[in-house]
Amino acid sequence: MENKFFAAFFLLLVLFSSQEIIGGEGRTCQSKSHHFKYMCTSNHNCAIVCRNEGFSGGRCHGFHRRCYCTRLC
């Protein structure tokens, strides 16, 4: 009986510890910047260009280092 209790407790512990905590910020969508033309080397510069395009931010992404703008979906 004690072994079954321990097994059930351990299973519940593993189950609850593997649950991801989801914040209230929602999903983030990405779109390639239309105004950032060259290789993206600075996330800060990318974010400034994206804010001027009406997005909430931006970051350099991918092998070719392109600027992708981000916003809440």
From Swiss-Prot:
Primary site of residence? secreted
**Where in the sequence is the signal peptide annotated?**
1-26
Pull one GO CC term from this UniProt entry. Answer: extracellular region
* A biological process from GO: defense response
The record's section on InterPro entries has:
Defensin_plant, Scorpion_toxin-like, Scorpion_toxin-like_sf
Write the record's keywords in alphabetical order, separated by commas: Antimicrobial, Disulfide bond, Fungicide, Plant defense, Secreted, Signal
Q: Keyword Signal, does the record have it? A: yes
**Superkingdom of the source species:** Eukaryota
Q: Does the keyword Signal apply?
A: yes
Disulphide-bridged cysteine pairs:
29-73, 40-60, 46-67, 50-69
What is the protein named?
Answer: Defensin-like protein 6
> What organism does the record attribute this protein to?
Arabidopsis thaliana (Mouse-ear cress)
This protein's encoding gene: PDF2.5
